[in-house]
Design a protein with these regions (language model features):
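Acidic (Asp/Glu) and glycine-rich low-complexity loops/linkers
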Residues: 19-112, 116-131, 142-151, 159-167, ...
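Bacterial Sec-dependent N-terminal signal peptides
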Residues: 1-30
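A residue-level signal for conserved active-site and pocket-lining positions in enzyme catalytic cores
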Residues: 46, 74, 109, 134, ...
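Short, surface-exposed interaction patches in beta-rich subdomains
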Residues: 158-238
Length: 238
């Protein structure tokens, strides 16, 4: 009897969600973000589709479904970080939230939830820090600089190309750093859980792999400084 009641409640809740989703007004609204000329980093929360482009002139524009009109928070703070947030609402998809951002350089990217960041162009700079959580993803980001620092959690995925003098990668859960076309001289790496990393290293790597994590690499680097535990592994790819 108890199991039947739970099942009925689950069906009712699903029906309410589906009915609510059908009635949502998905007419598209859009607006320009003020102070876009100061953007040097992006913080994304929720199911946003972000299109990040490299360009000499900075600009930022958002497009969202009408039912989210009073729930969207998009602004640039005094430190030059563009915040893209949305208050919790049932039935949000990435088709409901879109941002187009054009900036000369990028120093910081943080994304959570189910946000996707798609990149065009080549970004150059001294340092770049990336933090991805949940099911967030970065696709086709090209970066050339001195340092890159990447932290991945949950089921996040970072797809990058480019080059750096030094790279640091920390990945947990089932996250993935898909970077075979990113070349670094030195790598500091920490992989846990079932996380995976693929990168090109030319000189040396240090760090620790645990759980069922896996590091694949190209290049002739010295990896004797990488410790292995559990079922973790290192594979050289020709």
């Amino acid at each position: 009897m108890k199991a039947k009641s739970i099942f009925c409640l689950a069906v009712f809740a699903m029906s309410v969600m589906l009915f609510s989703n059908c009635k949502k007004d998905r007419t598209k609204h859009s607006r320009e973000i003020s102070n876009a000329q100061n953007i040097r980093g992006i913080v994304v929360e929720g199911s946003w589709s972000v299109y990040l482009r490299q360009g000499e002139q900075s600009s930022a524009k958002i497009e969202y479904s009408a039912f989210l009109d009073d729930k969207v928070d998009a602004r640039v703070d005094n430190d030059g970080y563009l915040y893209l947030k949305v208050r919790r609402s049932i039935g949000i998809t990435r088709n409901d939230l879109k941002a187009i951002v054009t900036i000369p350089k990028i120093e910081y990217i943080k994304a959570s939830g189910a946000s996707h960041i798609n990149s065009e162009g080549v970004f150059e700079g001294k340092a770049n820090k990336i933090e991805l959580n949940g099911a967030s993803k970065i696709n086709s980001l090209t970066y050339r600089g001195n340092d890159i620092d990447i932290t991945l959690n949950g089921a996040s995925r970072c797809n990058m190309s480019g080059e750096a003098e030094r790279a640091k990668i920390e990945a947990n859960g089932s996250s993935e750093a898909a970077m075979p076309d990113f070349t670094t001289k030195t790598l500091e790496i920490y992989l846990n859980g079932s996380s995976d990393a693929f990168i090109t290293i030319t000189e040396r790597a240090t760090g620790k792999l645990s759980g069922a994590s896996k590091l694949r690499y190209r290049g002739n680097a010295d990896l004797s400084g990488v410790q292995l535990s559990g079922a973790s592994s290192i594979q050289k790819v020709e």
